[in-house]
Curated annotation (Swiss-Prot):
One annotated GO molecular function: structural constituent of ribosome
Keyword Kinase: no
Keywords linked to the UniProt accession: Ribonucleoprotein, Ribosomal protein
Source organism of the structure: Burkholderia multivorans (strain ATCC 17616 / 249)
GO CC annotation, single: ribosome
Family according to the record: Belongs to the bacterial ribosomal protein bL34 family.
Protein name: Large ribosomal subunit protein bL34
Any GO BP annotation: translation
Matches recorded under InterPro entries: Ribosomal_bL34 (IPR000271), Ribosomal_bL34_CS (IPR020939)
Pfam families: Ribosomal_L34 (PF00468)
Length: 44
């Protein structure tokens, strides 16, 4: 059986990247929440 996680850098960046997060209000909320929490990595 094939596993569900088949890593791809392109897909990873396109769906969870910083620029994608900044496009929507919800995404910006995520970034701000991670900033407030003090996360080292805000987005992938």
């Amino acid at each position: 059986m094939k596993r569900t996680y088949q890593p791809s850098v392109t897909r990873r960046k396109r769906t969870h990247g910083f620029r994608v997060r900044m496009k929507t209000a919800g995404g910006r909320k995520v970034i701000n929440a991670r900033r407030a929490k003090g996360r080292k990595r805000l987005a992938i």
